[in-house]
Regions:
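Short beta-edge strand/loop motif at the mouth of beta-sheet-based domains
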Residues: 6, 26-61, 151-153
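A short, structured loop/turn motif at beta-sheet edges
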Residues: 15-16, 39, 67-74, 98-108
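Terminal, regulation- and interaction-focused segments at domain boundaries
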Residues: 1-15
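Short, highly charged C-terminal tails/helix-capping segments
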Residues: 142-153
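Amphipathic alpha-helical segments
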Residues: 12-31
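Hydrophobic pocket/interface hotspot
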Residues: 18-19, 28, 46-48, 66, ...
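Beta-strand/loop substructures that line and gate deep hydrophobic ligand-binding cavities in soluble
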Residues: 84-134, 152
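Hydrophobic/aromatic beta-strand elements that line small-molecule binding cavities or substrate pockets
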Residues: 7-9, 61-68, 93-101
Length: 153
């Protein structure tokens, strides 16, 4: 069995701008990840990485393949796998992110991550996932609405 994590946020930005924040490397590096590889097309890779030590020698990464890529409506990343610094892999999962204009200046961003395991190996990942997405979406809001990147970016 598996679980689904979902959250959403309305931001003052167009769907095009919000979509770009998730799919353009230079944007992702400002608010979400320490490293990114993004092939902007169906079948392209979507991969993000975060350092877990000050030297930047090890870390976490999440990698999958765009099963759908429909600017500015949304995208689906399939075969998503999370890897720890100890090389433990969790997956596969599916990540769906949608963008809907709710006014001329606002967009609803909906994040749905499916396939989150219930086995003990998933406990720490599952416990932090909803909180991590909520915090990341607030970081996205700060970037899109205020131009404020994460510290050190």
């Amino acid at each position: 069995m598996s679980q689904t994590i979902a959250c959403e946020l309305v931001v003052r930005a167009s769907p095009e701008r919000a979509f770009a924040a998730f799919t353009e490397v230079r944007e992702v590096l400002k608010w979400l990840a320490d490293g990114a590889v993004i092939g902007q097309r169906e079948g392209g890779r979507w991969g993000l990485g975060w350092y877990s030590d000050p030297e930047g020698t090890s870390g976490y990464n999440i990698v999958g393949v765009f099963g759908e890529f429909e600017p500015p409506l949304g995208f689906v990343v399939r075969d998503l796998t999370f890897t720890t610094p100890e090389d433990e892999e969790l997956g596969p999962m599916t990540l769906t992110i949608g963008f809907e204009a709710v006014s001329p200046e606002e967009t609803r961003i909906a994040v749905v991550q499916q396939g989150v395991g219930e086995e003990p190996a998933w406990d720490a990942y599952r416990a932090g996932l909803g909180i991590s997405w909520a915090r990341s979406l607030e970081d996205l809001r700060a970037w899109l609405e205020e131009g404020r990147p994460l510290p050190g970016r």
